[in-house]
Every structure is written in structure tokens, then in C-alpha cells.
Amino acid sequence: MRFLIIGLIILIAYLMIRKKFSLFGFTEDMSRNLKSGFQLIEASSPVIQANLKKSVSNAMMGVVLILITVLLFMKIKIVLFLLPIAFFLLGYLFLFNNHFSKLKSQQIWYNAKTNEVFIEQLKGENYTFNMFKDIEAVQKIESIQTTKGLLYGYYRIKLKNKILEIPYLVAENKPANNLFFDTIAQNFNIVTQKRIFPII
């Protein structure tokens, strides 16, 4: 019964994320027309869908490990070590939701000629900055390990008056966004921090 409930929770979370993915959006046509000379730095649908599938796969593996732990606990208590792994895998689905929500809360526009970046926010004021004048520090916050080809993380860019956070989902849209992220990598000392769950 407990596993049925866990499975239902995962299914509901998955359906809610899929619904958010299909219904959410900026008024992109108008935005694209207004920003001549700027490239939209975004995550592609294939990248998002691939990460969602991997996250669901990891979460289901977590459910299986919990089931194995409970079934074998009375006979082999050493299987308890599987529980932390199981909850870690379950966390991937909620981590995806966190990063996807951040992804859809903002749009990043980049002008490669002027190095100007315009941030369009769903909530809050829009703002601009220059990559070579306004960036004070760059960090990468990422998971402690890659699991089944899945590595969650985000860039944390400290500006003079703002903090810009960009999920790895955006950086994975290659080669479309290579110039933007290559410019950052080549001109700033990026400090990497490892976390169990890199929640934005």
C-alpha cells in the first residue's frame, strides 16, 4: 500500500510537470521581434524532455530500492544502506521540477557583438548587464555525481546588484548556446561547488 502511494505521488508529480511544460510560456513571438541582434539563450524541448525521462527513471529506481529494502529488512538488515540511495534517486524528480520552474521564470537574451545580456523575468523587474563590466564572480553549483547520464546543476553569476542563476538545462542546448557559455568559461575563474541536491 505504501509503495502504491509513493508511485501515485511520483505519477502525479510527473503529470504536473508535463502539464506545466506544455502550458507555460512567455509571449515569445513578441519578445523575439523586439530584440533584434539578441540571441535567446534557452533550453531546447528535446533537452528538457530527455532530462525529465531520466529523472522519472531514477525516481522509479528509487521506489524499487525502497520496496527491496522493506521486503528484505526482516531477513537482511544490512539492506538498510539502500534507503539513502533510494531517497537520493527519488529526489531527482523534484530537482527537475525546481530547475524547470527556474528555467521558465526567466528568459536570457545575449548580444554577442556588444556582450550585453537582457534578462526578462516572469516575476520581478527585467534588467540588463554587460558580461565584461558587470560580472563579479561565477560559480557552478552541481550534484555530487552523475547518475545514469544525468547531472543537475546551475551557474550562479554574481552581478553588482543581482544574482543570475542559469540551470544546466540551458547550457546543455548545444551548439546553440555554446558562444554564451564559452565566453563565460574563457573569461572568468569559475568555482565549482558540489551538493547532494543543487536546489536553486
Describe each region flagged by the PLM:
Residues 1-76:
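N-terminal membrane-targeting/pre-transmembrane regions
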Residues 5-12, 80-90:
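Hydrophobic core segments of alpha-helical transmembrane domains in multi-pass membrane proteins
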Residues 52-62, 106-116, 132-143:
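Juxtamembrane/interfacial segments around transmembrane helices
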Residues 58, 66-82, 89-103, 109:
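Transmembrane helical hairpin unit
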Residues 93-131:
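Conserved beta-hairpin
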Residues 118-176, 197-200:
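Non-transmembrane, membrane-adjacent beta-strand/coil modules in membrane-associated proteins
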Residues 177-200:
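Short, intrinsically disordered, charge-rich cytosolic tails of integral membrane proteins
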